[in-house]
From Swiss-Prot:
<feature type="region of interest" description="Disordered">
    <location>
        <begin position="463"/>
        <end position="743"/>
    </location>
</feature>
<dbReference type="InterPro" id="IPR019734">
    <property type="entry name" value="TPR_rpt"/>
</dbReference>
<dbReference type="InterPro" id="IPR003029">
    <property type="entry name" value="S1_domain"/>
</dbReference>
<keyword id="KW-0677">Repeat</keyword>
<feature type="modified residue" description="Phosphoserine">
    <location>
        <position position="666"/>
    </location>
</feature>
<dbReference type="GO" id="GO:0003676">
    <property type="term" value="F:nucleic acid binding"/>
</dbReference>
<keyword id="KW-0597">Phosphoprotein</keyword>
<dbReference type="Pfam" id="PF13414">
    <property type="entry name" value="TPR_11"/>
</dbReference>
<feature type="compositionally biased region" description="Polar residues">
    <location>
        <begin position="661"/>
        <end position="673"/>
    </location>
</feature>
<feature type="compositionally biased region" description="Polar residues">
    <location>
        <begin position="594"/>
        <end position="605"/>
    </location>
</feature>
<comment type="similarity">
    <text>Belongs to the TTC14 family.</text>
</comment>
<dbReference type="InterPro" id="IPR039190">
    <property type="entry name" value="TTC14"/>
</dbReference>
<feature type="compositionally biased region" description="Basic residues">
    <location>
        <begin position="497"/>
        <end position="506"/>
    </location>
</feature>
<feature type="region of interest" description="Disordered">
    <location>
        <begin position="35"/>
        <end position="55"/>
    </location>
</feature>
<dbReference type="InterPro" id="IPR011990">
    <property type="entry name" value="TPR-like_helical_dom_sf"/>
</dbReference>
<feature type="compositionally biased region" description="Basic and acidic residues">
    <location>
        <begin position="606"/>
        <end position="616"/>
    </location>
</feature>
<feature type="compositionally biased region" description="Low complexity">
    <location>
        <begin position="475"/>
        <end position="496"/>
    </location>
</feature>
Length: 766
């Protein structure tokens, strides 16, 4: 209850209204508490003194009875407006609601009453509009024609004047009279600054400070006729045609025809539309059922219209006119979006066309609006099962399973969904088993592929190794060819040295006779070999190029046999130099011991590839034996005598063995000296016949002098005559013939190869 409003009404109407409220609102609990407190001061109040007042109260008895009967509605808080206060400025809202001229214009009221009511209702800060009537030095006077805010009054015929002082007129220039800007007849909008109600005088101002804060943005000053309020323009039209009634003018306005005028005015006045206030008990919303309201009635009406469209669509569907049926269903859903029958019918049409997803959506909407609809549930279950079958064909088993389960949740007794779900589970189990088997097969295939790849890699590695070996052999063959070139160069150098030292040998022939006596000594052979080693330079370490390359070495030996005649001349020349020097070195001591040790070393190297070497030597001996017969026959007799001398010198040469170290001046030279000794021993004992032949030739040279060189020049002719005898010797001793005419540096290389093969044979196999 609004207590303030109740107290105001009781204070106005007195105890008569209080007694009527007690009799009418005795059942209302809100009035029981309020009337008890409000009646006490009324009981003690003195009766009104005049009879005239009693008569006036008697006239108001009907109003008091109306208030007492409708007190629960009149004093309810729901009547209190919660809307913000409307703006007091008159806006041009012609399109929103009907703007009418002032009501007193349609009534016959005297001008004195209008003037009195105007000065009673006018307040400071209100906006007035008028025309300038006269301009004076202290200001200008204006005649009011209408009000710009607040109440609406027709004051154009009242001739009310207002003064605007000079101090309230803003200047429009820095220097000049502010009144010069204004002229008589200008329409001025101004704010009321002061009111003299008794003398009916008004003072206005053109400054915005005279207006209240919520109207401070309004422009004051000169305005045009178009900026006049709408109600004033309507009043001017009404004055020109005074025969028009209030209703005709209201109906002719555009705002009155606006369909949203009620909502606009209710919002502007702050009245709730859901619970509209009414003083008629029959029109109160509490006394009506929900089905009697407009919303429910509208739903019923739209549902009936939608059902008519659905029936027409079903008839089209039975005939086979699916397009027309779809149009009718859509029309029904436009009228009523939640029409269950229209949704079910359209879903069935979608299902027959094959668009199952749309059908499922319509059936689900129908079940949401009406959960007890049988056809919607039934059709939805069938559509879900059919859609699950489609997904199962697409191999989307999980989605199909979800559709089957959804159908079972809607209807647990739906057998089609149960059967489809069981079949799907069985198929999924079988497919899983097949996948596992396929995975196992794939794993096995992968392992096989890996094995085959490993085998291929092994084969490739073997091929690479074989290719590397071939490359090494080719590189070694190239090194052998370079060695051949070096041998040929050494032979050419030996021939040139032979010519240079020819004269020196003649001078040394006499000294060689004296050295002939010392050949009986055991150390004479040792002296020749040590001198031989000193004549040759230290060879380079080329053992790496001859590893496992015996065939190339054998080819090299064959080339050396072809150059045996020049080599024989070089060797005789070297022996002549050695014997003429007269020195007795100690290098040859212990030759038999070195021979035995070399046999063991060479044996290990020869056992690796005996077949190839023997075959090669036999072929080489058979091809080259004829060219060497003449020379071997000439040296046979001297070999026998030299062999006897060497056997006698074995014991004596051991005493000279330690002295061989004296000739080594550096590690490289010492290593070379020991290797040269070993090679000399091998050369001496493995090819003893060659050595004896050389010794015999040396003795002949000492006795005959220059005839040796003539015999060497004719060695080619002797070879032709003595070829058969040399063939026999080559069969008996192939090894001695291979190495008989080689230079000392090649013999050293062969010895290094033999030592390397021995070391390689002694290493443990990995």
């Amino acid at each position: 209850m609004d207590r303030d409003l109740l107290r105001q009404s009781l204070g106005c109407h007195g105890p008569a209204l209080l007694s009527l409220l007690r009799s009418e609102q005795q059942d209302n609990p809100h009035f029981r508490s309020l009337l008890g407190t409000a009646a006490e001061p009324a009981r003690g109040a003195a009766p009104p003194p005049g009879a005239g007042r009693k008569e006036k109260r008697v006239d108001n008895i009907e109003i008091q009875k109306f208030i007492s009967k409708k007190a629960d509605l009149l004093f309810a808080l729901s009547w209190k407006s919660d809307a913000s206060p409307p703006s007091e400025v008159h806006d041009d809202n012609d399109n929103l609601y009907a703007v009418m001229p002032p009501l007193e214009q349609f009534m016959e009221m005297p001008s004195m009453d209008r003037r009195e009511l105007f000065f009673r209702d006018i307040e400071r800060g209100d906006i007035v509009i008028g025309r300038i009537s006269s301009i004076r030095e202290f200001g200008f006077f204006m005649v009011l024609i209408c009000l710009g805010s607040g109440i609406v009054r027709d004051i154009s015929h009242l001739e009310i004047t207002a003064l605007c002082p000079l101090r309230d007129v803003p200047s429009h220039s820095n220097h000049g009279d502010p009144l010069s800007y204004y002229q008589t007849g200008d329409i001025i909008r101004a704010g009321i600054k002061d009111i003299d109600r008794y003398h009916e005088k008004l003072a206005v101002s053109l400054y915005s400070s005279s207006l209240p804060p919520h109207m401070a943005g309004i422009k004051l000053g000169v305005i045009t006729s178009e900026e006049l309020p709408m109600y004033y323009r309507r009043s001017v039209e009404l004055n020109s045609n005074s025969l028009e009634s209030y209703e005709n003018i209201m109906q002719s306005s555009l705002g009155f025809v606006n369909p949203g005028v009620v909502e606009f005015l209710l919002e502007k006045l702050g009245i709730d539309e859901s619970h509209p206030p009414s003083l008629m008990r029959g029109l109160q919303s509490k006394n009506f059922s929900e089905d009697d309201f407009a919303s429910a009635l509208r739903k019923k009406q739209s549902a009936s219209w939608a059902l008519k469209c659905v029936k027409i669509g079903v008839d089209y569907f039975k005939v086979g006119r699916h397009v027309d049926a779809m149009n009718e269903y859509n029309k029904a859903l436009e009228i009523d979006k939640q029409n269950v029958e229209a949704l079910v019918a359209r879903g069935a049409l979608y299902a027959t066309k094959g668009s199952l997803n749309k059908a499922i959506e319509d059936f689900e909407l129908a079940l949401e609006n009406c959960p007890t609809h049988r056809n919607a549930r039934k059709y939805l279950c069938q559509t879900l099962v059919e859609r699950g079958g489609q997904l199962e064909e697409e191999e989307k088993f999980l989605n199909a399973e979800s559709y089957y389960k959804k159908a079972l949740t809607l209807d647990e007794t739906f057998k089609d969904a149960e059967d489809a779900l069981q079949k799907l589970h069985k198929y999924m189990q079988k497919s899983l088993e097949l996948r596992e088997k396929q995975a196992e097969k794939e794993e096995k295939q992968k392992t096989k592929k890996i094995e085959t790849r490993a085998e291929k890699l092994r084969k490739l590695l073997k091929e690479e190794k074989r290719l590397k070996k071939k490359r090494r052999k080719s590189s070694s063959s190239s090194s052998v060819s370079s060695a051949d070139e070096s041998v040929s160069s050494s032979s050419s150098s030996s021939s040139s040295s032979h010519k240079r030292h020819k004269k020196s040998k003649r001078n040394r022939s006499e000294s060689s006779r004296s050295s002939k006596r010392h050949w009986s000594r055991p150390s004479s052979g040792h002296t020749d070999q040590s001198r031989k080693d000193d004549c040759y330079p230290v060879p380079t370490n080329t053992s790496a190029s001859f590893l496992n390359q015996k065939q190339e070495v054998e080819k090299l030996l064959e080339k050396q046999d072809r150059l045996q005649c020049p080599n024989a001349q070089v060797k005789e020349k070297e022996r002549g130099l050695l014997t003429s020097s007269g020195e007795v070195p100690d290098d040859l001591g212990g030759r038999s011991d070195f021979y035995n040790s070399y046999k063991t070393q060479a044996g290990s190297s020869k056992t690796e590839k005996p077949y190839k070497s023997e075959r090669h030597f036999s072929r080489r001996n058979s091809s080259d034996s004829f060219s060497r017969n003449s020379e071997d026959k000439m040296k046979a007799s001297s070999y026998r005598r030299f062999e006897k001398d060497t056997e006698g010198r074995k014991d004596h040469s051991r005493r000279w063995e330690p002295s061989s170290v004296k000739y080594s001046t550096s590690p490289a030279s010492s290593d070379y000296s020991w290797k040269s000794l070993e090679k000399q021993k091998k050369y001496t004992y493995s090819g003893s016949r060659d050595v004896s032949k050389h010794e015999q030739r040396y003795q002949l040279n000492t006795n005959q002098g220059e005839r040796v060189y003539e015999k060497e020049d004719s060695c080619g002719e002797g070879n032709r005559n003595e070829a058969p005898e040399e063939m026999l010797n080559s069969k008996e001793q192939p090894d001695s013939r291979v190495k008989k005419n080689l230079p000392q540096n090649l013999l050293n290389i062969f010895n290094q190869i033999a030592e390397f093969e021995k070391e390689k044979g002694n290493k443990p196999k990995k």
